[in-house]
């Protein structure tokens, strides 16, 4: 992938995160921006593997949830597996992603009517992509 395309994708993900934080009345901390850049780099660069190490309560799960919602918007056919040591932690992450999808302005068309396909551990979205966010 060209450097120009990688930069455009990073910008798109950062914009999505900034919009989410603005909706919550917050600004995006610099370390969240670095985490998002890392996640985009892992997603776009083979071998698509990385290890994210950050201090407790640094917002790793917050950024990963925003990243997952953005991936679903860009590629609605994607399947994302969330693993954790305890099922309550993975269910909480799914709930975080669901909250973003339900409330981010760019995600309105992704919510299925009746939400029949949603549960504590699974989200199925409408196969549409964000109207204002596209891959370069």
Tell where the protein language model's regions lie, with residue ranges.
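N-terminal accessory segments
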Residues: 1-48
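N-terminal cationic-hydrophobic initiation segments that often serve targeting/anchoring roles
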Residues: 43, 72-73
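Conserved SF1/SF2 helicase motif Ia
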Residues: 74-85
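Conserved small/polar residues in nucleotide/adenosyl-binding loops
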Residues: 131-136
